[in-house]
Structures are given as C-alpha cells and as structure tokens.
C-alpha cells in the first residue's frame, strides 16, 4: 500500500507504507475491527481436550457448557462478545501452561506469519500496549523442548513417511 502517496509501495524504507500494508493484509485476512483475538481461560480439571484445537471453532455458549471461564472467573461472553461467537482452544505450552480461546482475529495474525508463538506474541503485545494484564497462568520453564537439529530430524522422518510438510528446516 502506498500510504505516503509518493507513487511507490515501499514496505522496507517507509514505516507508514509498511504499517498500512500490514493493516491491509490483516483486513483481507478477515480481521474484525473491535473484536478480540482471544483471551486466557480457565479449564476444569475434568476437561477432555482431545481433538480440540484453535482451528476447531465452537460457540462460546458451548465452551461455557463445558465448564470454561475467563481466567479471572468471569463469563466467556460479555461486553460486545456474544455467546454465539466462535472460538478455538489453544494450549501452546501444553496442559501445564496457559490456555486460550482464540477467535478469527488470531487466525488473521497467524495467516501473516504461520507460527502460533508469533501470533500469540503480537496479540498479547497489543493487549499490553492498551493496558492489558500479563498472562495469569505461568509458562512452564522446566521443559527445554527439542533442539533445532531434533526438529529437523523429525521433519525428515515425516517427509520420508510421505507427509508433505515442505522443506525440513528445523
């Protein structure tokens, strides 16, 4: 987008063009102005999350029936968010870390950079810049995860087994 009106779309050397181009991309990716990206939730101890993901959207009323609340204990549907709003479950650090219900705006961020960690970081940063609070549930730090070499090896194994995951880049 040529936001500066100088006749060039310059996302490298023009901050206004870069920001306007990003905003245009998000709009084309179904960003909904005035709607949240998501929020941290509390799930009941007996909750079965098998088969759930950020892609499998359910109405907030259904999540409520299954025992979810916002992390502060308040209802999921409040303010300008109705009980029919669709959200998916995201637990980026597994069962020992924070869990989120994410909406279409999270998906728009994800489409810009296909990494849940990126989308979550950008979404949370935007909340914090507007006075939002930090995540309540601590992020587990005792699990080092797997190394880049181990990720590459796993990707190579998937490719050898016929899965089309693109290049093994770790």
Language-model segments: residues:
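Long, repeat-rich segments with strong aromatic
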Residues: 8-124
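Acidic, glycine-anchored loop motifs typical of Ca2+
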Residues: 3-11, 169
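Short acidic, glycine/serine/threonine-rich helix-capping segments at coil-helix boundaries
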Residues: 146-151, 156-170
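Conserved alpha/beta core segments of nucleic-acid transaction machinery
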Residues: 135-145
